[in-house]
Amino acid sequence: MSQIVRVALDVPLYRYFDYLVSGDEQVTAADIGRRVQVPFGRRTMIGIIVDLPPTSDLPNEQLRPIETVLHDLPRLPDDWLRLTEFCSGYYHAPPGQVMLSTLPVALRSPKSAKGARRLARPATSAAGGQALPALRAEQEAALAAIHQAGPGFHSFLLHGVTGSGKTEVYLRLIESSLLAGKQALLLVPEINLTPQLEARVAARFPSVALVSLHSGLGEAARQRNWQAALTGTARIVLGTRLAAFTPLPELGLIIVDEEHDPSFKQQDGVRYSARDLAVFRARQLAIPIVLGSATPSLESWANATAGVGRSRYQLLSLRERAVAGARLPLVRRIDTRLDRAENGLSAALRAALAQRLECGEQSLLFLNRRGYAPVVGCPACGWTSGCPRCAAHLVLHLRDRCLRCHHCGFAVPVAKACPTCGNQNLIAFGRGTQRLEATLAEIFPQARVLRVDRDSASTRRQWEALAARIDGGQADILVGTQMLAKGHDFARLTLVGVIAPDAALFAADWRAAERLFAQLMQ
């Protein structure tokens, strides 16, 4: 009797596909989770074996034989298969697309599938050791609560103000996991947060294999790091939302930093919440998970404060800053109806910037709008630069001389005249980071103004170069979007100005108020 294998393929269909095992192949239950090369239509595709059913819905005569089972890597573990199956069912995504989309590109391509073994090599840290800092009472209490919970699934919400030492708590928990012979997974929302955190983790654990996984890596580096995690060589995995799917055979701890951040949600392709998948993964593996944030999401806060017998998370609080004597910043609200802003800057803010320049200190102006102006319009007929593909406005990027949609990527050159009435006196309404940068250069010609947004730091290398300039004192005024406003520690920074923060409340987002609060607190 011919043996049947059930295979998941990267196709937009909510089903698996049955194949026959050819005469020279031998497939057992131990091969469930292995990659397999199969014919599909006129193509050859890479799939994943998910089952060995005794029979198929189709007669054997209609089933095609597999080409080969790939043994170049260990099989994907059972918990990984259950995780991707849950994601498929919960988020209504084709199962094959969920599974295959999480693999490095080379491992799902028939042309390069057999090169996987050659790329696999251990990823280790060459950083030096580091003395452990003393813990405050609140940090010790948080660690004690987590350790006293004992083995099994436990979920914790670590609510700590900015600078309260949450990262040190993470490192102590990772140390405990490593001592127990387990792997640790640390998720962060943004690529630009990984270099600083990766350096800190590497310095703490110099002899432990650490890898990072995010979209900023090249395909070869991502495949190498992914394979190190799968084989168990990597003991600590640091990554963004896609790393939630990383196969880890000895996973013992999951940490989600900045759990409230919307970047943990995949908004296109296979949609999912990496934070929620991390909680599911911890539950099915019966391991602890820690969600950390200075501004927890409303649903996480509700899960932690619902009351005895109803709370899903245990709330742990860090109310004081880790540095002795450090205080929360003084917040001053400027009513621009009274202190009218010129070019977006009130008189009080301009005076504060001038004072910091005299003292040789850094300032940061936060404006969560890229480009030069958010919209271009015609005062004669009322035309505005709308995107023909979606409902968003086309943003003016003056240096590139183009109008670009920040939602779908559509771009066109800047029009010399209104396409509706022919008026050549078009007006750029509002301001973005490029316009604010130009304004600051005019007001403070002696200042070194540095803009940090997705346009100036689109790659990790660009971000690291900008961060080195900031840390090296080569910038006096920083202009940035949300990628600069969270998770960073700049020693010379003593002033933060937020430009028109209430504009965020008018976004077409029911979480607008929640996200504005989180940004301001960060």
Can you say where each PLM-predicted feature lies in the sequence?
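Conserved RecA-like helicase motor core of SF1/SF2 enzymes
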Residues: 257-276, 471-476, 481-522
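Conserved helicase ATPase core of P-loop NTP-dependent helicases/translocases
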Residues: 218-230, 448-480
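Conserved helicase motor "Helicase C" RecA-like lobe of SF1/SF2 P-loop NTPases
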Residues: 194-205, 376-389, 433-448
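Accessory, non-ATPase domains that flank or precede helicase/AAA+ motor cores in DNA-metabolism machines
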Residues: 1-295, 299-301, 305-326, 357-358, ...
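SF2 helicase motor core recognition
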Residues: 239-251, 373, 440, 460, ...
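Cys/His-rich Zn2+-binding cysteine-cluster or related metal-binding knuckle/ribbon modules and their
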Residues: 12-14, 215, 219, 231-234, ...
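Flexible beta-alpha connector loops of hexameric P-loop NTPases
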Residues: 211-219, 261-272, 337-343, 425-429, ...
